[in-house]
Regions:
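Hydrophobic alpha-helical segments and helix pairs
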Residues: 86-137
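Intrinsically disordered, low-complexity, positively biased terminal segments
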Residues: 2, 9-14, 34, 47-48, ...
Length: 280
């Protein structure tokens, strides 16, 4: 049998998202377009006799950071060594970088053996949030309506490197809505909600205060008509966990954020929900 690892096409990335949905990860309906825009060479497919059977994404950000996701071997080929070959090819692409990932519970021990260490846990909370309106002195605007450079600079406070190609696509795809919170002309919050096969996902979710973050979630749910939402909440930000509970969301799924190097220097206090488990 012949096993070959190649760089995936846009269609392959769509297939990877479908596999992720089979695993219960509930990616957004159109996420694959933004994923491919982030780094078109990042998506590796392992083909057994020409048939796709395993995958990994290894996105390069800037010069020093990378994020690993979509590490999947299809059930019929698990335990046969194909997944680890894809893993090794992916890690080779990110050699010399601080690499992050969000690992499912069953794989965390293996990731530690590969040099990753636990930074925090992302706890997915799901439920029906109350309607939200901006706190006093704060207004909401469509994130596409402000200068993109301003939005990208704000996003950079919470992410280790610039990700302009990804971000520009992330806010403009169909089946989603994005809002910024403004106070005295300054951005004090930003959130995106996208439709998924199950609960609509929120990410990123940034806010100068829990009240701003909460209101963004409620406003986005109203805009999209979402009856159920899901947020991957970093448990290192205790007010974020408390906020998810206060708006009626319940824990449903857990991953570990792990890095090969130091925790990135970002504004964790304003990070109420990570963007995606696949690309960070």
């Amino acid at each position: 049998m012949s096993f070959e690892i190649t760089v995936g096409s846009a269609d392959d990335v769509q297939r990877m998202a479908s596999w992720a949905n089979d695993e219960g990860w509930n990616p957004g309906n159109t996420d694959d377009h933004a994923f491919f825009a982030a780094d078109p060479g990042a998506f590796l497919i392992g083909r057994l006799d020409g048939e796709p059977q395993a995958c990994i994404s290894v996105v390069k950000y800037g010069t020093g950071f990378g994020f690993l996701g979509f590490y999947i071997a299809r059930p019929p080929v698990r335990g046969k060594g194909y997944g680890i070959q894809v893993w090794q090819a992916g890690m080779a692409r990110l050699a010399g970088r601080n690499v992050g990932l969000d690992g499912v519970v069953a794989q965390q021990g293996n990731y530690k053996k590969s040099g990753f260490r636990l930074a925090w846990n992302n706890i997915r909370h799901e439920g029906a949030p109350p309607a939200g309106k901006p706190p006093a002195g704060v207004t909401f605007a469509d994130a596409r309506s402000i200068g993109f450079d301003r939005l990208a600079a704000y996003d950079r406070k919470f992410f280790p490197e610039a990700r302009d190609s990804f971000l520009a696509t992330w806010i403009s795809l169909p089946e989603r809505a994005s809002l910024v919170a403004l106070r005295d002309g300054e951005i004090v919050g930003f959130a995106v909600m996208r439709a998924c096969a199950a609960a609509s996902r929120v990410g990123p979710l940034y806010g100068a205060t829990p009240e701003i973050a909460s209101a963004l979630v409620g406003a986005l749910a109203t805009t999209l008509g979402a009856t159920a939402v899901a947020i991957d909440v970093p448990d290192r930000n205790k007010p974020a966990v408390k906020l998810a509970e206060q708006i009626g969301l319940k824990p449903s799924f857990e991953t570990a954020r792990m890095y090969t190097g130091a925790d990135p220097d970002v504004d964790y206090a304003g990070l109420f929900g990570v963007t995606s488990l696949e690309l960070g």
